[in-house]
Amino acid sequence: MKNSEKRGRKHKRQDASSAENAGGEVKEASANEASLPQSPEPVSASEANPSPSRRSRGRGKKRRLNNESEAGNQRTSSPERSRSRLHHSDTKNGDCSNGMIVSTTTESIPAAPSWETVVKVVPSMDAVVKVFCVHTEPNFSLPWQRKRQYSSGSSGFIIGGRRVLTNAHSVEHHTQVKLKKRGSDTKYLATVLAIGTECDIALLTVTDDEFWEGVSPVEFGDLPALQDAVTVVGYPIGGDTISVTSGVVSRMEILSYVHGSTELLGLQIDAAINSGNSGGPAFNDKGKCVGIAFQSLKHEDAENIGYVIPTPVIVHFIQDYEKHDKYTGFPVLGIEWQKMENPDLRKSMGMESHQKGVRIRRIEPTAPESQVLKPSDIILSFDGVNIANDGTVPFRHGERIGFSYLISQKYTGDSALVKVLRNKEILEFNIKLAIHKRLIPAHISGKPPSYFIVAGFVFTTVSVPYLRSEYGKEYEFDAPVKLLEKHLHAMAQSVDEQLVVVSQVLVSDINIGYEEIVNTQVVAFNGKPVKNLKGLAGMVENCEDEYMKFNLDYDQIVVLDTKTAKEATLDILTTHCIPSAMSDDLKTEERN
């Protein structure tokens, strides 16, 4: 792509706390919490009158998505990938819209739950609670600030050990979480014990003993079969009391989890999952929980398609927390692989007619398996289970599933036996499994974003939340092409590698001529490669050369007088009411 093209942000669309992202009730947080659905928070002056447009170098738009995940990646039967939309049944980060999801086609009314099924579910319904959360999200575009707080409502349910399960996106960036039991007028303060972003599950508890009185925990059932009846219970939009919808299991496969930006086992059901249902349990006909409602599909040709987190994923999350006293995540095999369905391809790789498997294309440099596996190895089996040429393994009678399911059943730090074919020789390796280290992480949790400012240049690291903050929900089409390429294909070469960019330039006399530099990667400083933001901040702070030279992407350079630039920084910070030239984590690390 030509260097003469400008890079930058587009005009931001009005987001209103991203209420459109996935339904649910959203209201401004206040001391007086109204129980009725209210309007999304108003547009701020900056949102209503965006700054001058900065043209992007993104891909051409093909469709509009309401969420950070594409329906085409869900492997559903959607005939038109360009029009389908996946939604949290609550909303992004728990933010909920107070509007119903409307389809252009006439939706059929789901059948009412049978009396026998309802009777069996009734004892478990008392364990279903309503979750009230106040969120305060970081401002990734202005990392020294936080966004205006907002509140959301979703569902949850009580399990053993005085704990409550709900969705991770329902309590992400929480500042306060309260729970209310069925038939109660009291809201109890809750503590978040763990948040699993990949699996979209959060674990809560309540210290008040009164909350646990007179309620029995929900019991988990086995993985349901296709066409098994399910009843979804929760507190969706449209009322304040508990709601029950019913349907059947219509599909079971590896799904893209919208919030987690990962792929795990999921159930597709035809029971209605509406805004506010997030975190609510799905019961079988015996009154046992077989899943957690978490997202739905919006498509003009789709009706009543909801998705449920199944019990194997839930149990993995709970056992992971109990085993490590924290959530460590779902391990992955750090490879990219290719199907071996073509017979000529198999012969060229030295495979016998009876051998099946998948070819390794690339290996994550930070993954433990990079020490033993090599590109073009053929993975024949994982932990004794043979892998087919299309990458599937036997699941249940008459069913097959992607072999990533086998990996997701493991825990971080577990070992797995991998059999590979290399140069017509069969080899076996014991591999220690670990979580995925992404160059551009899907989530930044537990701390505000890092930043560093000198001479008005705002340096920060790129993450998916940052891209979404800069370019909106359609960042995959509007962000600069080079950032998107790194997001989709780049692999971190070390565990501490980060993608550092000039986010923006706060205009001052010292940076005349550099004002249009926006979201451009910093490649080197004074001839030394920039590995991460901490390293860049350290080099700038300790620079004693006459000039500071920043090498940027697209072969751009920035040269500043070192003494003048450092002196001008304080005035720029004062002008823009920025409390510090760097985030607290960089200060702490530098002192250490």
UniProtKB/Swiss-Prot annotation:
Gene Ontology BP term (one) = proteolysis
Q: Name the Gene3D superfamilies for this protein.
A: 2.30.42.10, 3.20.190.20, Trypsin-like serine proteases
**Bias type Basic and acidic residues, positions:** 78-93
Keyword Mitochondrion present in the record's keywords: the answer is no
Q: Where in the cell is it found?
A: Nucleus
Single GO molecular-function term? serine-type endopeptidase activity
Please list where the region (Serine protease) is annotated. 141-318
Pfam families on file: PDZ_2 (PF13180), PDZ_3 (PF17815), Trypsin_2 (PF13365)
Q: What induces it?
A: Induced by trans-zeatin (at protein level).
Q: Where is this region: Disordered?
A: 1-101
UniProt note on tissues of expression: Expressed in roots, cotyledons, rosette leaves, cauline leaves, stems, flowers and siliques.
Active site (UniProt): 169, 200, 278
Bias category Basic residues: which stretches? 54-64
The organism's superkingdom is given as: Eukaryota
Residue ranges of the PDZ domain? Answer: 334-414
Using the UniProt record, name the top-level EC class of this enzyme in a single word: hydrolase
* One Gene Ontology cellular component annotation held by this UniProt entry: nucleolus
EC number(s) reported in the record: 3.4.21.-
Question: From start to end residue, where is composition biased (Polar residues)?
Answer: 68-77
Write out the similarity annotation: Belongs to the peptidase S1C family.
Summarize the protein's role: Serine protease that degrades the two-component response regulator ARR4. Regulates ARR4 stability by targeting ARR4 in the nucleus for degradation. Acts upstream of ARR4 and regulates the activity of ARR4 in cytokinin and light-signaling pathways. ARR4 mediates the cross-talk between light and cytokinin signaling through modulation of the activity of phytochrome B.
Give the quaternary structure: Homooctamer formed by 4 homodimers. Interacts with ARR4.
The protein here is known as Protease Do-like 9
What organism does this protein naturally occur in?
Answer: Arabidopsis thaliana (Mouse-ear cress)
